[in-house]
């Protein structure tokens, strides 16, 4: 009955819980000896395969036996899958035992899951790990906690094992390894002993030299890296300093140029005025002091090259300050004829000024229609639209003149007077047209041309007011 109960437990672990059941895990879980756990697993596999030949069970076996390797006999213990069991048995010279190690539903690719299952169960039963084991040793007694702590300290204080010793330990298999060369306890005497000692000393010196050379190479590489880094930072610092110096030089040069421009802008005004005021006196003095004048001319030529930009700026500013005359678009409306009336007549509203300016302040009158006579044969007074100039200051503070059409009443006598005034106005108009040519000649004649233009505008305004 007990065996049947155990088999039911194993079936529940494998099929229902889908666990990997090893003989160690089963012995700790059920509290049975390891040999009994191995027998239980074997019985479960046999019964399950007899009942259902298509049952999905994967079994791993623990195989042990003697093996001859490199001419030496050794004892081998291996965990293999069921499909590789016969191949491993054939390699063994003598097969000592074959036991069921684990049962699981899935095929295992490696031994990792088996190790994890045994590791977890052993960790939980670490104090009683040999309770259900088949290996027993009466001399193996658990140590006291004080002794265990002292042994741990001694292990920490022991010097570490050299890698050469570790390599020699790894090469040994089951106590058999390559023969270790025995060191000669007695040194050879005479000449052979001298040569042997010299060879040993040379080998030691060679090892020391290789170590020192390796250290020197490492140190030289580090020094080179440090030198490269220091050189890089020094070059960067030099570049930043050069950039700062260039910026300071540019700022100083710009400040000096601004100062020179301010100094140079003042003398041209004072120099041009006396030239315009008294050109005859300058001609007389130039004849008397020709050698001195030649030197001054050379200096002036140099200055003129520098002041050309400033003078162009001044002329542009002067042009902006000149009066801007705006002429309205030509109106094609006919003159209106209005009969005489004793009361005062109302003037028509002026048309808006056009945007296109023109420098000609010439009065323009529309063509006069033939005089209209009344029924009594008397001439009637007629109104006429006349172009008149109006001056005002704009937002920038400049004087602006605009031409506006205004209606005026006129008779035959007034028409004759206006024809005369128009003949008087014509010569100033020609003078106004010549202004741009005079401006092109140079900045020296610009001020004189400005004065003439102002006088002509004033004269035309005076005649229009009459």
Curated annotation (Swiss-Prot):
Primary localization class, coarse: cytoplasm
InterPro entries: POLD3, POLD3_sf
Record field: compositional bias (Basic and acidic residues): 205-218, 255-265, 281-297, 432-441
Keyword DNA damage: yes
List of residues that carry Phosphothreonine: 411
Key words, A-Z: Acetylation, Cytoplasm, DNA damage, DNA excision, DNA repair, DNA replication, Isopeptide bond, Nucleus, Phosphoprotein, Ubl conjugation
N-acetylalanine modification, residue list: 2
Highest taxon of the lineage: Eukaryota
Localization annotation: Cytoplasm; Nucleus
GO biological process: DNA biosynthetic process; DNA strand elongation involved in DNA replication; DNA synthesis involved in UV-damage excision repair; nucleotide-excision repair, DNA gap filling
Span of the annotated motif PIP-box: 456-463
Glycyl lysine isopeptide (Lys-Gly) (interchain with G-Cter in SUMO2) crosslink, residue number(s): 259, 262, 433
Any one cellular-component term (Gene Ontology): delta DNA polymerase complex
Record's signal peptide: none
Pro residues bias: start-end ranges: 350-360
Residue location of crosslink Glycyl lysine isopeptide (Lys-Gly) (interchain with G-Cter in SUMO): 259, 433
UniProt key word Acetylation: yes
Residues recorded with modification Phosphoserine: 308, 407, 409, 413
Post-translational modification: Ubiquitinated, but not targeted to the proteasome. Sumoylated. Sumoylation by SUMO3 may be predominant.
Annotated region described as Disordered, given as residue ranges: 145-218, 255-466
Comment text on domains: The PIP-box mediates the interaction with PCNA.
Record text on subunit structure and interactions: Component of both the DNA polymerase delta and DNA polymerase zeta complexes. The tetrameric DNA polymerase delta complex (Pol-delta4), which consists of POLD1/p125, POLD2/p50, POLD3/p66/p68 and POLD4/p12, with POLD1 bearing DNA polymerase and 3' to 5' proofreading exonuclease activities. Within this complex, directly interacts with POLD2. Following stress caused by DNA damaging agents or by replication stress, POLD4 is degraded and Pol-delta4 is converted into a trimeric form of the complex (Pol-delta3), which consists of POLD1, POLD2 and POLD3.
The protein's role, per its UniProt record: Accessory component of both the DNA polymerase delta complex and the DNA polymerase zeta complex. As a component of the trimeric and tetrameric DNA polymerase delta complexes (Pol-delta3 and Pol-delta4, respectively), plays a role in high fidelity genome replication, including in lagging strand synthesis, and repair. Required for optimal Pol-delta activity. Stabilizes the Pol-delta complex and plays a major role in Pol-delta stimulation by PCNA. Pol-delta3 and Pol-delta4 are characterized by the absence or the presence of POLD4. They exhibit differences in catalytic activity.
Protein name (Swiss-Prot/TrEMBL): DNA polymerase delta subunit 3
Taxonomic source organism: Bos taurus
């Amino acid at each position: 009955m007990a065996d049947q109960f155990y088999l039911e437990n194993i079936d529940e672990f494998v099929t229902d819980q889908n666990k990997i059941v090893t003989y160690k895990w089963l012995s700790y879980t059920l509290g049975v000896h390891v040999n009994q756990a191995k027998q239980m697993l074997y019985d479960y596999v046999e019964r399950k395969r007899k009942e259902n030949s298509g049952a999905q069970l994967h079994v791993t076996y623990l195989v042990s036996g003697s093996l001859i390797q490199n001419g030496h006999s050794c004892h081998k213990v291996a965990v293999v899958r069921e499909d590789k069991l016969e191949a491993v048995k054939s390699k063994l010279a003598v097969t000592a035992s074959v036991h069921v190690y684990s049962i699981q539903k899935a095929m295992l690719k490696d031994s990792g899951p088996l190790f994890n299952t045994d590791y977890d169960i052993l960790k939980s039963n670490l104090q009683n790990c040999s309770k259900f084991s088949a290996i027993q040793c009466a001399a193996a007694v658990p140590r006291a906690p004080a002794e265990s702590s002292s042994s741990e300290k001694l292990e920490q204080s022991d010097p570490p094992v050299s890698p050469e010793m570790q390599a020699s330990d790894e090469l040994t298999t089951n106590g058999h390894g390559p023969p270790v060369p025995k060191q000669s306890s007695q040194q050879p005497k005479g000449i052979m002993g001298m040569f042997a000692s010299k060879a040993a000393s040379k080998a030691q010196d060679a090892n020391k030299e290789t170590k020192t050379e390796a250290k020197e190479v490492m140190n030289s590489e580090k020094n080179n890296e440090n030198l490269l880094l220091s050189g890089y930072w020094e070059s960067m610092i030099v570049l930043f300093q050069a950039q700062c110096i260039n910026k300071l030089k540019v700022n100083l040069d710009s400040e000096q140029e601004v100062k020179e421009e301010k100094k140079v802008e003042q003398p041209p005004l004072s120099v041009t005025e006396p030239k315009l005021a008294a050109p005859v006196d300058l001609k007389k003095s130039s004849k008397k002091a020709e050698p001195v004048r030649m030197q001054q001319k050379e200096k002036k030529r140099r200055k003129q090259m520098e002041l050309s930009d400033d003078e162009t700026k001044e002329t542009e500013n002067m042009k902006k300050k000149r009066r801007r005359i705006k002429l309205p678009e030509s109106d094609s409306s006919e003159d209106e004829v209005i009969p005489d009336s004793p009361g005062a007549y109302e003037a028509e509203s002026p048309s808006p000024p056009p945007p296109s300016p023109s420098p000609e302040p010439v009065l323009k009158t529309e063509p006069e229609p033939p005089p209209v006579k009344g029924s009594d044969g008397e001439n009637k007074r007629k109104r006429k639209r006349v172009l008149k100039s109006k001056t005002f200051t704009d937002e920038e503070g400049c004087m602006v003149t605009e031409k506006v059409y205004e209606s005026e009443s006129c008779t035959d006598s007034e028409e004759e007077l206006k024809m005369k005034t128009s003949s008087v106005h014509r010569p100033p108009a020609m003078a106004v047209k010549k202004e741009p040519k005079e401006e092109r000649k140079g900045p020296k004649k610009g001020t004189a041309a400005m004065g003439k233009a102002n006088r002509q505008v004033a004269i035309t305004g005076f005649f229009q007011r009459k």
